[in-house]
Structure formats: structure tokens, C-alpha cells
From Swiss-Prot:
Homodimer. Coiled coil: none annotated. This is 3-hydroxydecanoyl-[acyl-carrier-protein] dehydratase. It comes from the Bacteria. GO terms for molecular function: (3R)-hydroxyacyl-[acyl-carrier-protein] dehydratase activity; trans-2-decenoyl-acyl-carrier-protein isomerase activity. PANTHER family: 3-HYDROXYACYL-[ACYL-CARRIER-PROTEIN] DEHYDRATASE, 3-HYDROXYDECANOYL-[ACYL-CARRIER-PROTEIN] DEHYDRATASE. The gene is fabA. GO terms for biological process: unsaturated fatty acid biosynthetic process. Keywords: Cytoplasm, Fatty acid biosynthesis, Fatty acid metabolism, Isomerase, Lipid biosynthesis, Lipid metabolism, Lyase. The active site is at H70. It catalyses: a (3R)-hydroxyacyl-[ACP] = a (2E)-enoyl-[ACP] + H2O; (3R)-hydroxydecanoyl-[ACP] = (2E)-decenoyl-[ACP] + H2O; (2E)-decenoyl-[ACP] = (3Z)-decenoyl-[ACP]. GO terms for cellular component: cytoplasm. Pathway: Lipid metabolism; fatty acid biosynthesis. It comes from Pseudomonas fluorescens (strain SBW25). The keyword Ribosomal protein does not apply.
Length: 171
């Protein structure tokens, strides 16, 4: 059976409700924290490290919730939302691979911001390059990611780490 390699907004909303990978497994956040409209490509092969990659997009409109409050008179998408979107996608990758448990961001290495998303932008593109997937007692993915706005790279993150846990009682 061939794995689905692209996901629509409705697919991602199903994932936020726990319906895509099953109860107790990886979920995306619900809107407003869902920072992705579609995954245009996901693969467990290829990419910069040969371990898999994801490409996803967020459509930008001036009425997105964060522009009204960050900042009044100087609207810009918070950089932390782009970083969170990259963690969301690494967790999605683990669920897509069939690894059980609830996703949790575990950290990252170096993060750089050198651009911004303004209300005049049209599209944000996320590019995730999987470096390593550990399967066993701990299921964990390590990836590098970038965020581009209208084709121009504006953020990078190295060593994004996300794990999936069958119990989060002691987390």
C-alpha cells in the first residue's frame, strides 16, 4: 500500500481532531495554532540527508489573528509561530510513519530569523529535512527546517527535535 504523500487542509484538521493517525497518536494543534494549510510533499526518502522531507504551506491574509495583536500599528507574524510550525511538521512526520504516541517538541539547536511575514505576503513555505529518526523505547525525529515567504528564505532552524510518547504522565 502506498502512503499518502500530500495532505489538504481538511486532512490536517482531521489530524488536529485525532482522526488521521488514531486516538492517542500524533495530532496537529487546532486552529488558531495550526500554522499549516497543506502539506504538498512528504517522503521518508530523499531530502538533504536522504532520510525524508516535508514541504508545507500557509496562506497569508491580512485578517490572520496574530496580525491584530503582534504588533498594533506594526503587524508581523511572530517568529515563534514559524518555529512552532516546523515542530508541528516534524511531529506529523512521526505520526505519518506510524509511530505511536503523542507528539512533544523537545528543543532545537540554532534558530535564525532574518526576515519577516507581513500582512501583504501571500504564502509561507516550510521545508523540513529529516536528519534522523530513532525508533524504539523512544521515538524521536531530528530535522533541519526553513521558512520562506513568497519564495524568500527568512528563518532557519537546525536540530529540531520532536518525540512521540505513549504516556506523558512524567513529561
Amino acid at each position: 500500500m502506498t502512503k499518502q504523500n500530500a495532505f489538504t487542509r481538511e486532512d490536517l484538521l482531521r489530524c488536529s481532531r485525532g482522526e488521521l493517525f488514531g486516538p492517542g497518536n500524533a495530532q496537529l494543534p487546532a486552529p488558531n495554532m495550526l500554522m499549516v494549510d497543506r502539506i504538498t510533499h512528504i517522503s521518508e526518502e530523499g531530502g538533504k540527508y536522504g532520510k525524508g522531507e516535508l514541504v508545507a504551506e500557509l496562506d497569508i491574509t491580512p485578517d490572520l489573528w496574530f496580525f491584530a495583536c503582534h504588533f498594533e500599528g506594526d503587524p508581523v507574524m511572530p517568529g515563534c509561530l514559524g518555529l512552532d510550525a516546523m515542530w508541528q511538521l516534524v511531529g506529523f512526520f512521526l505520526g505519518w510513519q506510524g509511530l505511536p504516541g503523542r507528539g512533544r517538541a523537545l528543543g532545537s539547536g540554532e534558530v535564525k530569523f532574518f526576515g519577516q511575514v507581513l500582512p501583504t505576503a501571500k504564502k509561507v513555505t516550510y521545508n523540513i529535512q529529516i536528519k534522523r529518526v530513532l525508533k524504539g523505547k523512544l521515538n524521536l525525529a531530528i530535522a533541519d527546517g526553513s521558512v520562506s515567504v513568497d519564495g524568500r528564505e527568512i528563518y532557519t532552524a537546525e536540530g529540531l527535535r520532536v518525540g512521540v510518547f505513549t504516556s506523558t504522565d512524567n513529561f
